C-alpha cells in the first residue's frame, strides 16, 4: 500500500479553508452541513484508507478546536427575512415570539424554563420551537447535561429542548461552562475525547418550577422563566403533535424577527423571580428573622435549611427583590 502523500498537519492546512468542524458538525466553505464527512473526505483523493480519514479527523479537531467558529445561521432565518408576513397559523403572543427570536439568535448566556399549568399550551409551544429548529434537538435534562457521556449526545445539536428538568445533584461548574459557551471536554462513545464549545440554545418545559440554588448568582443570571397559567378552553389534543408546514414555520420566524427586542429580558423579570423563590426554603420560612428560628421552621416543614451564611445571602436577595418586608419585621419587634 502506498504511503500517504501528506502528513495530518499538512492535511489540516489543506482542508482548513474547505471544511469547518463546529460543535460536532462539519460544514463546507459555503456553510452547508456535510452529512457524510467520511465519504466526502475519501472522494477528495487525499486519503488511502478509511483509517486515514479517522486519524485526520481526530487531528483536525485537536488542531482547530481552540479556534472553533460559531455556527452559521439556520437557513430558515434567511428565508424569513425575505418573506411577506401573513397571519400566524397558531396564536403566539409577544413573549413567545421574543423567546423564538432569542433562541434563534442565541447571543446571550441564558436558558429558558417554561412552566405553568397543564392544558395551557406549553407542549404545543415547545413543539413549534422544535420544528422551527428543524427537529435538530436533543431531549437532555439538566442532570444529563451534568454527565460527560450523555452530554456528548447533545453536541452537534442546535437546541436542547426537554420536557423534563431533573435539577437534583447538578454539576453547576459543568453547567456554567455549557451555558456560557466555554470549552468543555466531550467524551463520545467509541471516539477520542475532545474539547468543544456547547453552542446549543436551551429550552426546558415543566409543570412546576424546580428548586434551584439562589446562592449561585452565576447560574441565576442565566435563567429566565416564562409562565403559561391560563388553561385553553376546548383545546385541540392533536396540536402538541401537529407537523407544521415549512411555509408556516418560516412565517412564524418572520414574525419573531419583527418583534421589539429592546430590553427584552426585563419582560420576564417578575415571573422569573416569582418562580425562583416559590420553592425556596428561605422564602417559605420568610417570617423568621433569625437563623435559629428559620432552621427550626424548616425542620417542622420537612425542608432542608441552608447554612447560616447562605441563609443570610438568600435572605438579603429576597429583601432586595421585595419578597421580605423588613419594615414590617421592625414594626413587629417594636410592639
Locate predicted features.
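Feature primarily recognizes SF3-like P-loop helicase cores of small DNA viruses
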Residues: 53-57, 67-88, 94-120, 124-335
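N-terminal accessory nucleic-acid engagement/regulatory domains that precede
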Residues: 2-76
